[in-house]
Curated annotation (Swiss-Prot):
Transmembrane segments: none annotated. SMART domains: EFh. Residues 6-41, 42-77, 93-128, 129-164 form the EF-hand domain. GO terms for biological process: adenylate cyclase-activating G protein-coupled cAMP receptor signaling pathway; cellular response to starvation; oscillatory cAMP signaling. The keyword Ubl conjugation does not apply. Ca(2+) 2 binds at D55, D57, D59, K61, E66. May be involved in the phase-shift of cells from growth to differentiation. It comes from Dictyostelium discoideum (Social amoeba). Ca(2+) 4 binds at D142, N144, D146, T148, E153. This is Calfumirin-1. Ca(2+) 1 binds at D19, N21, D23, E25, E30.
Length: 169
């Protein structure tokens, strides 16, 4: 883990190097270019994290004042790591939800779930109207409207649910 001094030096270097118009502000585009230069795995995501930590007024720019103000770098790093841990936990929850859904409804051990499998699953769980429940699920999850639900469609659906439950993430 980098020391606070290293972080301060890196931020100053970033300002000196990538504040292209020398206005004392870093835009998201400048940050993305910075991380590309550093050969970051995902420069856009790195820029987003940078802005989540340092763009205190959420105006889409990181200013020298925001960087040099009352920033507690250790606290900022801790918050960043907590957000990362929460994000990983949410990803794990999505995968658990997908697995549970597949186990409950997939009757022929392939990866797609059909309307008939949904109906059968709802019958087994005692749903009042299994066909209506199946139709609702297909309407919500079957994005390509082919009559089956794929793992990809499940993942997209459960990620949307996570975002609704955790809008600040």
């Amino acid at each position: 883990m980098a020391s606070t001094q290293n972080i301060v030096e890196e931020v100053q270097k970033m300002l000196d190097t990538y504040d292209t118009n020398k206005d004392g502000e870093i835009t998201k585009a400048e940050a993305v270019e910075y991380f590309k230069g550093k050969k970051a795995f995902n420069p856009e995501r790195s820029a987003i994290y940078l802005f989540q930590v340092y763009d205190k007024d959420n105006d889409g720019k990181i200013t020298i004042k925001e960087l040099a103000g009352d920033i507690d770098f250790d606290k900022a790093l801790k918050e960043y790591k907590e957000k990362q841990a929460k994000s990983k936990q949410q990803e794990a929850e999505v995968e658990e939800d997908i697995e549970a859904f597949i186990l409950r409804h997939n009757k022929d051990d392939n990866t797609d779930i059909t309307k008939d499998e949904l109906i059968q699953g709802f019958k087994e769980t005692g749903a009042k109207d299994p066909e209506k429940s199946a139709n609702f699920i297909l309407t919500e999850m079957d994005t390509n409207k082919d009559g089956t639900i794929t793992v990809k469609e499940l993942r997209v659906y459960y990620q949307k649910v996570q975002k609704l439950l955790n809008p600040d993430q």
